[in-house]
């Protein structure tokens, strides 16, 4: 994804 938090899943 674009946001770092979105990729933490």
UniProtKB/Swiss-Prot annotation:
GO terms for biological process: lignin catabolic process. Cu cation binds at residue 9. Belongs to the multicopper oxidase family. It comes from the Eukaryota. Transmembrane segments: none annotated. One of its GO terms (molecular function) is hydroquinone:oxygen oxidoreductase activity. The keyword Acyltransferase does not apply. On the 2D-gel the determined pI of this protein is: 4.27, its MW is: 54.49 kDa. Keywords: Copper, Lignin degradation, Metal-binding, Oxidoreductase, Secreted. Lignin degradation and detoxification of lignin-derived products. It is found in: Secreted. It catalyses: 4 hydroquinone + O2 = 4 benzosemiquinone + 2 H2O. The keyword Secreted applies. Binds 4 Cu cations per monomer. It comes from Cerrena unicolor. Its main location: secreted. This is Laccase-1b. Optimum temperature is 60 degrees Celsius. Its cofactor is Cu cation.
